[in-house]
Amino acid sequence: MSSKRTKTKTKKRPQRATSNVFAMFDQSQIQEFKEAFNMIDQNRDGFIDKEDLHDMLASLGKNPTDEYLDAMMNEAPGPINFTMFLTMFGEKLNGTDPEDVIRNAFACFDEEATGTIQEDYLRELLTTMGDRFTDEEVDELYREAPIDKKGNFNYIEFTRILKHGAKDKDD
């Protein structure tokens, strides 16, 4: 009789679970994702397609190749409606390290425990150690990074932004 039980258990679940995706985010995050989705869905048909991606990237001054757009579209298992968009972001965000792990990685180079690292020193570390960044990648990182007038990179705030998004200027 036990062999019948094991047969019924092994039948389920090759499917992607999207039903709980809305529970992963609070209302304000869902609203921000909805606004982003609507900006990308240029033709307003409720789905993001290759043309929508191209138009959105072009509006940002980028000129993406067909191969690049195809690679982006292939990350989705099917048509990208809002639920799929949210699911994909949830998977990406769940794939990042926990906040304390990221913060502690930066803290290793913060000998004074100030919560900041001198931006030139951090650039040197990022371009010469481990999985090396290019100067362009560091420039992109610094573009929206919390760096004060003295050139101190606030890694505590940066980690918060990385995991939770930037605060609005109005806040």
From Swiss-Prot:
Gene3D superfamilies: EF-hand
Keyword line: Calcium, Metal-binding, Motor protein, Muscle protein, Myosin, Phosphoprotein, Repeat
Record-listed Phosphoserine modification sites: S19
One annotated Gene Ontology cellular component of this protein: cytosol
Residues with the Phosphothreonine modification: T18
SUPFAM superfamilies: EF-hand (SSF47473)
Entry-linked InterPro entries: EF-hand-dom_pair (IPR011992), EF_Hand_1_Ca_BS (IPR018247), EF_hand_DJBP (IPR015070), EF_hand_dom (IPR002048), Myosin_RLC (IPR050403)
PTM per Swiss-Prot/TrEMBL: Phosphorylation increases the actin-activated myosin ATPase activity and thereby regulates the contractile activity. It is required to generate the driving force in the migration of the cells but not necessary for localization of myosin-2 at the leading edge.
GO molecular function per UniProt: calcium ion binding; myosin heavy chain binding
Binding positions (Ca(2+)): D41, N43, D45, D52
SUBUNIT field: Myosin is a hexamer of 2 heavy chains and 4 light chains.
Note: This chain binds calcium.
Protein's name according to its UniProt entry: Myosin regulatory light chain 12A
Organism: Homo sapiens (Human)
Chain's gene name: MYL12A
